[in-house]
Amino acid sequence: MQSLLCVRQYVKDGNEKEKALAAKIDELWHGMEFDWYRNGDQNVLYWHWSPNYGWEMNFPLEGYNECLITYILAASSPTHSVPAACYHEGWARSGGIKSASKPYGYPLELKHNGAEEKGGPLFWAHYSYIGLDPRNLTDQYANYWNVVRNHAMSDYQYCVTNPKGYKGYGPDCWGLTAVSYTHLTLPTNSR
């Protein structure tokens, strides 16, 4: 949705086809029921609902990971917004999101889900910021520009240090991201 909103802003004053596209995007934006993903009135958003399984997956979106943008969009929805408590209790885990970890001397500021000590894949630092500029974005938990910068710097330093001796890691090959497999065939095998 964040990318569509960027497109909408770009084409809204364009030709008739572009204006029609902007109107469709706006209709979709107004129709997104972010508040429904609270699974009742819980102060957290849930990953998904299925017509076959309902809320069975029971996967709350808690930070820090790529889901920050979901809370930003949900809070700013013109029709189906969520209360601030949803962000603070859900995303920020009632303050439990804060971290004192400093991999390679770079403060993470936030606990990266599943990678609290050293930070997670850079996908987490990129996805929410496709259409959201982290510069000057702060709240009581973090300065998000620092979060993104320090995450990238610690990732870079990890690859330069290469503590596990992975082939190719180094100052010219870094930027680890999330994948669902461990065997790559091109250009070379890596982990």
Spans of features found by a protein language model:
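Ser/Thr/Asn(+Pro)-rich, low-complexity disordered segments
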Residues: M1-L184, R191
